[in-house]
Design a protein with these regions (language model features):
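Active-site metal-binding loops of divalent metal-dependent hydrolases
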Residues: 28-30, 57, 81, 121-124, ...
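Metallo-beta-lactamase
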Residues: 80-130, 134-137
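Active-site metal-binding motif and surrounding structural segment of the metallo-beta-lactamase
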Residues: 32-78
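Hydrophobic alpha-helical segments, chiefly the membrane-spanning helices
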Residues: 169-175
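Hydrophobic packing residues within well-ordered alpha-helices of enzyme cores
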Residues: 35, 65-68, 86, 153, ...
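Conserved beta-strand hairpin/beta-sheet module of binuclear metal-dependent hydrolase folds
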Residues: 1-42, 128-145
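Short amphipathic alpha-helices and their capping/turn segments at secondary-structure boundaries
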Residues: 148-157
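Conserved small/polar residues in nucleotide/adenosyl-binding loops
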Residues: 158-163
């Protein structure tokens, strides 16, 4: 599994997560041109993307969503409230609302060979989520714009330590 930050920050967010056969974007908050450049740098194009996971509806997370969706007809995943806000926004232009796929926090779903778990986060948006993506034993999580995090989120982000990490935790620390 591979994760690449195409863009991150207040000017726009777009993260690539993928396996050998399934390719996802988390957010599309930069121009379609910049997304294409980022994908090209890792040997992909928009045609390779199997889904876009939207964390919330703020412009720095959806700026390129309309163009990307229209051009490549990529399914868009997000909470019902987030998708309703996106569909109501005139700034995205016309796009196929049939590509909008609602997800529920804490209910896993599959995109290709990747298991995706959305989970609630604290942010001033319409039911925002972060995502944990798993492929076999490997997983990665993307949690943006969090006001704070609690024990529940820590548990979701935690993965079983490797045997090496477990062995290290048994060793006395050097002073």
């Amino acid at each position: 599994m591979r994760m690449v930050s195409i863009a991150s920050g207040s000017s726009g967010n777009c993260i690539y997560i993928g396996s050998d056969s399934t390719h996802l974007l988390v957010d599309a908050g930069i121009s379609n041109k910049r997304i294409q450049q980022g994908l090209n740098e890792i040997g992909l194009t928009g045609n390779d993307v199997n889904g876009i996971l939207i964390t919330h509806e703020h412009s720095d997370h959806i700026k390129g969503l309309g163009v990307l969706s229209r051009k490549y007809e990529i399914p868009i995943y997000g909470t019902r409230e987030t998708l309703d806000e996106i569909a109501a926004a005139g700034s995205l232009g016309k796009f196929d609302k049939g590509l909008l796929t609602p997800v529920c926090p804490d209910l896993d779903f599959m995109v290709g060979d990747l298991t995706v778990k959305p989970f609630k986060i604290d942010h001033d948006a319409a039911n925002p989520v972060a995502y944990r993506v798993q492929n076999g034993e490997k997983s990665v999580a993307v949690a943006t714009d969090m006001g704070h995090f609690d024990q529940y989120i820590i548990c979701l982000l935690y993965t079983s330590p490797s045997p090496r990490d477990t062995e290290r935790s048994r060793m006395p620390s050097s002073a």
